[in-house]
Amino acid sequence: MKIKTTILLVLATSALFATSCREKLAEAKSDPLLRAYDSEQDWNNPDRIIPLNYQQAQGKRVFYQYCVWCHADATPAGPSNRSNLNPMPPLANDGAVFNSLSDDFLRNTITLGGSAVGKSGLMPPWGKTLSQEDIDAVIVFYRAIAQPPYQAPAQPGPKYSVR
């Protein structure tokens, strides 16, 4: 009789434990930050954290190595050079500027430099420094942090590319 009681007690405890694990697993699946590869603090709202997938996280890495010096107000080393440039480059999270530009246009701007696409000649061509995968990752990162949030076009526009 003691063995049956012990077995029933162990089974009941195991069932309760399994149920609580399932609840925590369901909770983890619903929280995008727990599934994120990395995150970025919203530049406009410090209380908001933006979850990043792997490609967006790679873009963040490239951004903070090459782009932050002109496309952010602050860098890991202190203030950026942005305010010293004329025309002043847009912030990377400026959805009002970047949301209206196609991925191909951004790709060409990064690859060929600003003057190649009718923008500021102060934007250097990164095509020989960065791989196409890195450039695509930076674009995806910009889209992830854009304020207002980026909405992909329902139908892609005309395509021209350096590829």
Tell me what each language-model feature is:
Residues 22-24:
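Bacterial signal peptide processing site
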Residues 57-68, 101-105, 129-132, 154-157:
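Sequence context surrounding c-type heme c attachment/ligation sites in exported
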Residues 17-20:
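C-terminal motif of bacterial Sec signal peptides marking the signal peptidase cleavage site
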Residues 9-15:
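Bacterial N-terminal signal peptides
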Residues 26-62, 158-163:
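Electrostatic cytochrome c docking/interface patches
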Residues 54, 60-88, 112-121, 144-152:
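Periplasmic/extracellular electron-transfer cofactor-ligation site
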Residues 84-145:
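Extracytoplasmic electron-transfer domains, predominantly the class I c-type cytochrome c fold
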Residues 1-7:
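Bacterial N-terminal signal peptides that target proteins for export
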